Amino acid sequence: MSKKYLVAGATGLIGTTLVNQIPLNEDVTVIARRKINYKRPVNFLNLDECIKLPHADHLFICLGYPLELRDLLLMRKSIKAKFKAVDYNLVIKIAEAAKQSSIKSVSVISSIEAHPKSLNYYLKVKGQMENKIRELGFESVNIFRPSHLLGEREKEITLDVKIFEFFTNIAGNFLFGWFKKYK
């Protein structure tokens, strides 16, 4: 029997990769703001109109507001509300809708070093989101905490990100022990 999956944020780097990795015999519904072409057939729900979710075996939440590199360290005031609206409010709204639809299992993308009491706004919001997801009472909660996301994107990445990625690829070869998780 095939499984049913919901993927929120299916147009980003992780969401697109995830959708294309799910076996073709499985039923996938993507929740996104715009349609894109996948290597497999998908059902489409518009994120802005999504109030009630269809039942599924598992929900993947891969949402994230697009930030500039500098915003990860010290987020500009003009970005904070937009970031929180997506990375906390929208993530929680979708998770709550999933709970109402009797979805028992959820996986969500967070960030390495996320913590609700972090002094870094980005990490603090991610940590608060993780806690709220756990509080919703799903039977299974998977929280993935990647470091910097590398991969082919639809949009051209900026020069500062290219330089950062170049140096982190080199530095990654020298990270070991406790620092290995930052590769």
What do these predicted ranges mean?
Residues T17, Q21, A97, K132:
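Rossmann-fold NAD(P)-dependent oxidoreductase module
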Residues K4, D57-H58, S105:
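Structural motif
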Residues N37, V42-K93, A97-Q100:
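NAD(P)H-binding glycine-rich loop region in Rossmannoid oxidoreductase-like domains
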